[in-house]
Amino acid sequence: VFELGLLNIHCHLIDNLDKVGGQCAELYPEKPIYDIPSRPVVTGQELTDELIKQINPFKPKFHLNQQVDKIDKSEYGWIVETSVGVKIEAKCIIIAAGAGSFVPRKPPIENIDQFENKNVFYAVRNKSMFENKKLLIAGGGDSALDWTNELSKSSNVTLIHRRKEFRAAPDSVGRMQELESQGKVSFLKGTIKNIKRGSENKIVISYQSDENINDIEVDYLLPF
């Protein structure tokens, strides 16, 4: 949107989310980001807010909570129709979909939906709710490692992954391993198999490690 504004091109932005900001706003508004030029650290929401301020002078029009359903050629250029019936005529269409619509990466557990938004969360939108709680973070990518490192500052965090090798950035992996060596993070090699209710609003996670099935009781499960 910003680059189009510099070219004096008025922009309509269509997004399936209910807010502007994509991944930063939807998946990790409170997650510290360290790889933005000139910014030692910035949260996803702070970055989103600053980018919105940057494009405001160009007065883009946002169409949220909808997606493109149909594109037709017209005499003028193109007619785009969204899932709520909005029609936009434009000379050109730019697809900047990133990873596409966000779908939580759910572990293949039959009853996991019973615990969603209670004990199971697929994104961290409010870090304070996890303070002084026992967390199990599942995954081996950047989000899993970054949140393990960040939430360990104020929570009891265990990371579980099916193997000891990770997809995350080497720096994040190194920091997690250092925290583990200091006793600030625990690591389990295994695969989650089942969830059941525990004591005092907690949940019990059953996981398979090699040939063994073990249990761990936690307040929250965060699969990434």
Model-identified regions with their sequence ranges:
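Rossmann-like dinucleotide/flavin-binding elements
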Residues: 1-18, 116-169, 211-214
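N-terminal-biased segments
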Residues: 1-16, 85, 89-106
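Short amphipathic alpha-helical segments
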Residues: 2-3, 25-26, 105-109, 148-150, ...
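Conserved N-terminal glycine-rich FAD pyrophosphate-binding loop of Rossmann-like flavoproteins
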Residues: 17-42, 169-175
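Conserved FAD-binding subdomain of flavin-dependent enzymes
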Residues: 19, 36-63
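A Rossmann-like FAD-binding core segment of flavoenzymes
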Residues: 52-82, 88-90, 152-224
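Glycine-rich beta-alpha-beta "Rossmann" dinucleotide-binding loop(s) and their flanking helix/strand
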Residues: 84, 93, 97-123, 208-224
